[in-house]
Amino acid sequence: MSSSGTLSNYYVDSLIGHEGDEVFAARFGPPGPGTQGRPAGVADGPAAAAEFASCSFAPKSSVFSASWSAVAAQPPAAATMSGLYHPYVSPPPLAAAEPGRYVRSWMEPLPGFPGGAGGGGGSGGGGGGGSGGPGPVPSPGGPANGRHYGIKPETGAAPAPSAASTSSSTSSSSSSKRTECSAARESQGSGGPEFPCNSFLRDKAAAAAAAAAGNGPGVGIGTGPGTGGSSEPSACSDHPSPGCPLKEEEKQPPQPPQQQLDPNNPAANWIHARSTRKKRCPYTKYQTLELEKEFLFNMYLTRDRRYEVARILNLTERQVKIWFQNRRMKMKKMSKEKCPKGD
């Protein structure tokens, strides 16, 4: 081996570190094909000792001219170095105790790192025991940005098989059926109440089935106590049962929103103008009957009698005076209709 090759091996070995090969093998798995690593017995054989002893750092020009090409010609060594910064966290002990559930760890392999979207070479955490992530494995033609978080897998669907995770697909198929609610519930603890995700849909489907099993197809929810069986009337029903009283606010129809008037636009104000006069206050039947009786006795009232009638009927003197005036005009009009001018 030439001096340039020896220097290149020594350069890569110094970058990797002084830990043993067993530590890297246990952490990142066996190296890929063509990876040139540190020899097993570097200082064991006399040939290797003689080879390292022949290194000379005096001729600097020969070192820089010959070592750059040798270092650049080793891409597998650079791939081994990228594994040093792989953010991997060991699976939590709860997953081993309960294999049917899965707790998402806070730090999972990022999609940008090599192996983050991979097929099980120590890239996932969870119920698989560190043998592979339970998330969907991307196909060779699919997106390369890693797993999609927050997407619920199909019921009973196992992750797509790959060359590296064929043996771990059976162990992760049970954990692939999990939902996000179970993961959040286990992360918070088992002390709180459990609310299933699809409880609302299940209750709705049960109510629809109970309504369909009633007297006929036209039976709906909240149509009465004798039609739906055990179906409960809804709060928004127009025909509630007697056992479910609604508030007055819900019974009243919704009021249309009032239009805002623009003080700078008199035309719009005229379109939406309101009358300034007071609203018409009709008399009650009792007041009208008493005024008619008084009108039959006398078409004109004195001031004292008008005051007395107003006090009895709980009216003002002005209201009594106006009513008598209108009643006299009505009587005059009726008399003109009965007696036309031609006769």
From Swiss-Prot:
Main location: nucleus
Biased composition (Gly residues): 113-134, 220-229
DNA-binding region range list: 276-335
GO biological process terms held by the UniProt record: adult locomotory behavior; anterior/posterior pattern specification; DNA-templated transcription; embryonic forelimb morphogenesis; embryonic skeletal system development; embryonic skeletal system morphogenesis; forelimb morphogenesis; hindlimb morphogenesis
One Pfam match: Hox9_act
Subcellular location(s) per record: Nucleus
SMART domains, sorted: HOX (SM00389)
Function: Sequence-specific transcription factor which is part of a developmental regulatory system that provides cells with specific positional identities on the anterior-posterior axis.
Protein name: Homeobox protein Hox-D9
Organism listed in the record: Rattus norvegicus
